[in-house]
Amino acid sequence: VLAYCREKGYYLQLYVGDSILIKQENDCSRMYTKISGIQTTAIGDALYHTDEEPYKILVMTKSEEFAEVWQQFKQDFAGKLDVTSSKDNFLELMEPGVNKWEAVKSVAASYGVQPQEIMCIGDSNNDVKMIANAGIGVAVANAKDSVKQNAKIITASNNDDGVAMVIESILTPQAAE
């Protein structure tokens, strides 16, 4: 994957432990830090030769290229990577079976909570498996269509307190009446 990204000239970030590794600081890394508030660590060409095992690789593309790049990754790495996105130009690459739903399910199981007892709320493509499998899958109004199509409930936008509204309605059923 790293050689493929280097050959194609894609900006990428490796998520290793508590660090996000990049080749060099540039407009993409600055945009990511501005959006997320998380700092990256530039390591030069060592990025392509690291012995570290990343749990996620983020590839940033231009918005107009995103759909094509996504499909290319899905085709070229079918069965080898799960390919999803969190923003219109953020492509997330992980090992098959590594996703938000598997993480939620694992934590819930450690507390004896069954999948049908779980409520998950989301808005992006990387939330689809979580929303589709949770007992109560909720999409906010400003979610991607793929999330809404898999949700049992669509609440108000996250900008209009949709998350708080749906949690309150579940915890206090009379509030919905």
Residue ranges of each PLM-predicted region?
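Conserved acidic, metal-coordinating active-site core of Asp-based
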Residues: Y4-I121, M130
